[in-house]
Amino acid sequence: MSHKNRLKLGAFLSWLFPKIAKRRAHIVRTNLRLCFPEASEAQIEDWVKQNIRLTTQSFIDRAVLWYAPLEKIHEISCLTGFENLQKLLDTGEPTIILAPHFIGLDTAATVLTSIVPEGCTMYKSQRNPDMDEIIRKGRARFNIVHLLSRKDGFRGLVRFLRKGIPLYYLPDMDFGRDESIFVPFFNIQSATLPSTAQIAKMFNAKVTPVVTRLDIETGIYHIEQLPALEDFPGEDSIEEATARINQLLEEWIRRDPAQYYWVHRRFKTRPEGEADFY
């Protein structure tokens, strides 16, 4: 598929999305209203439109990531700051690549796995076995990528982190009350996985965030590998360190709110007694 047709198909899907996925469009709108109460309704609707356009383009572009030659992937991506990760890999220290749910999440993962010889990440199996196989193969196209199930838990990570094999970790999903703690996210008590802080403390691991932005005008994914967090978690409690991650995520989102993956019900799990937002 040509670059031009790729963007055209993404634009068509963004037009179709609100008509066939009204529930998801509602979730996007609700999340933005919750996180930006100061924004006008016109601004919210503009972000909703932008977010849907970016999200649908990222769906289309998975075909490029999973099937196209590597040079085609490089044509639609621009990686900066890789030296921040390379320094950690050179030392052999346990390393967490902190990858929040921005639109370009999959592009960042594919580009990094094409460079880093070996890595691991958590993976939730799909109900449809055919789709599961497609996704598994797509996410492990280049070099060695270990896809760990949530059932493996920390034990599944131990052998890789101790060998200096980096963990590509997504910190910002709501996996329910049993696996989460409540800490602020945009001033809302949010069920948040404490695993980033727990793993960093347990293995004395360095945490280097990766933040992405899709320029819809050019179709280029800009991938920014940031320096390792200083003194993390340090002397902070697990709750304080997890709140720190959420605060950083807020700062990155505020640069361009439409770039975040708002189609997820980020505030699905509520503290006891609170009403459902969705």
What does each model-found stretch correspond to?
Residues 1-99, 134-136:
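Membrane-anchoring hydrophobic helices of lipid-metabolizing enzymes
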Residues 17, 73, 123-124, 145, ...:
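A generic structural signal for short
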Residues 20, 39-49, 87-90, 114, ...:
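Non-catalytic C-terminal accessory region of glycerolipid acyltransferases
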Residues 75-78, 102, 128, 147-150, ...:
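A conditional alpha-helix N-cap/helix-loop micro-motif detector
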